[in-house]
Design a protein with these regions (language model features):
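A conserved mid-protein helix/loop that constitutes part of the nucleotide-sugar donor-binding site
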Residues: 15-20, 232, 241-255, 274-277, ...
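Membrane-proximal helix-turn-helix segments that form the acceptor-binding/catalytic region
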Residues: 134, 146-192
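Acidic anion/phosphate-binding donor-loop and adjacent secondary structure
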Residues: 139, 201-206, 212-213, 217-232
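Nucleotide-activated donor-binding/catalytic signature segment of Leloir-type glycosyltransferases, i.e.
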Residues: 268, 276-302
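Aromatic "clamp/platform" in nucleotide-sugar-dependent glycosyltransferases that forms part
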Residues: 316
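Short hydrophobic beta-strand element within catalytic cores of glycosyltransferases
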Residues: 333-336, 346
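Conserved acidic donor-binding segment of nucleotide-sugar-dependent glycosyltransferases
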Residues: 348-349, 353-360, 369-374
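A short, well-ordered alpha-helix in the C-terminal region of glycosyltransferases
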Residues: 362, 369, 376-391, 397-403
Length: 418
């Protein structure tokens, strides 16, 4: 197959998945070229050494608020302007792709709007690997964005109350436009592939569209056991961002009696500075040794996973989560909250422990059970690596992906021949 790829991904799990998918397709003899905007991360696991990579301009200008009316509609105009700029970028990419005789478009997510608009403009069979819908629109994090403002204390017709109402009305209209555009872009693809059955349900809830599960793989050559001694350390892995629920991990470690309390090391590809400050203050107040490490190399990551006694996984409704499987390949068991896609990767008692809810005391007891029983932790870790190698290898994942792409080409041919 001749495959055109489009993405607008930051560093992290999504880009890691795309890299291995492109690598696997090339190794299976397919011809692949990639398109992306300049804001996509091209330094982390770059595609350039694997395939021809085309960087197509994307530009928009944040409008300055001028006057009282301008201040009210600024956020709306910025959202619409950014959508139109991304649409124009996708149109230019599509013109290049349409002229090159590709068999299929394989798109990935957009870091700004999650669903790419490129499917609207490419005249090819088209498949998107959608890591998740725009969760800010559909989930309470911590509050649904659509909820009405609190009832005013005074008169509903007071100028200040009317001003708040109008500003909120404009804000919500911008959200509605984002949701409309996301759904229309999703409907333009012949197939939506997702990383878990949980994600399939999320797509169905958000868009009312069917999606198919194409499980990802994990690189067992990178993530491996080094045979190092295990320290009394709990490790967490993921961006230092509110969605990762790191405050729960700190509370869980704090629930372990202080004489036996392990340290908590958190490794992230980036950190939200204000959130990290809050975490450090929380850890200090709870007497938890908390160490954050940001942007470390894969070698350092693998060593850290090998030295930890256990991984704690507290992400909120994570669609899939590569981190637990990466830890498992390093023979590190995982304690995770039983929500989101992690229920499809962690088998309770086989490669870790699933905790039924976000209760820090329950999570802490599960962590202590592994930290205080090194022999059992080793047994879980050995089982974990064997299970990941058997079920979560990249060759099986690429074979599934290849089948879905070929199926879409065949379906499109059948439609064209009617």
């Amino acid at each position: 197959m001749r495959i055109a790829v489009w993405h607008n991904l930051p560093s992290g799990g999504g880009k890691r998945a795309l890299f291995h998918q492109v690598k696997g397709l090339v190794e299976r003899g397919h011809e692949v070229e990639s398109w992306c905007p300049p804001v996509a991360d091209r330094a982390f696991l770059p595609l350039g050494p694997l395939v021809a990579e085309h960087v197509v301009s994307l530009s928009w200008q944040e409008r300055e608020a001028r006057g009282r009316v301008g201040a009210v509609i600024q956020s709306y105009r910025n959202v619409v302007g950014k959508l139109r700029a991304m649409e124009e970028h996708c149109r230019r990419c599509a013109e290049e792709i349409n002229s090159k005789g590709f068999d299929v478009l394989f798109a990935h997510s957009c870091q700004f709007f999650r669903m790419s608009a490129i499917g609207r403009f490419v005249r090819l069979p088209k498949v998107i690997y959608q890591h998740e819908p725009d969760r800010d629109l559909y989930e309470a994090s911590p509050r649904l964005p659509w909820l009405a403002l609190p009832s005013p204390r005074g008169s509903s017709w007071a100028p200040r109350t009317i001003g708040r109402f109008v500003r909120d009305l404009v804000r919500v209209q911008a959200l509605r436009i984002r949701a409309r555009e996301e759904r229309e872009s999703a409907a333009a693809f012949g197939q939506i592939l997702v990383n878990s059955f949980y994600s399939r349900e999320s797509v169905l809830r958000a868009y009312g569209l069917e999606a198919r599960v194409c499980y990802l793989g994990v690189e067992s050559g990178i993530f491996r056991s080094l045979g190092l001694p295990r320290d009394r350390v709990v490790v967490g892995l993921g961006a230092i961002h509110q969605s990762k629920g790191i405050e729960t991990a700190i509370q869980a470690v704090a629930s372990i009696p202080e004489p036996q309390r392990p340290a908590l090391v958190w490794i992230g590809n980036f950190a939200v500075a204000a959130y990290l400050r809050d975490l450090n203050q929380q850890a200090d107040s709870l007497r938890v040794k908390f160490v954050s490490r940001v942007g470390i190399s894969d070698d350092d990551l693998v060593e850290s996973l090998n030295r930890a006694a256990v991984m704690v996984y507290t992400s909120r409704l994570e669609p899939f989560g590569l981190a637990p499987l990466e830890a498992n390949l390093c023979e590190t068991p995982v304690v995770a909250i039983a929500e989101g896609g992690v229920r499809e990767t962690i088998v309770d008692g086989l490669n870790g422990i699933l905790v039924p809810d976000r209760n820090p005391v329950l999570i802490g007891k599960a962590l202590a059970k592994i930290v205080d029983n090194p022999a059992w932790g080793r047994r879980l870790g050995e089982q974990a690596r064997a299970q990941v190698i058997e079920k979560w290898g990249w060759p099986r994942s690429i074979e599934r992906l290849e089948g879905y792409l070929m199926e879409e080409i065949e379906k499109s041919g059948s439609r064209d021949n009617r």
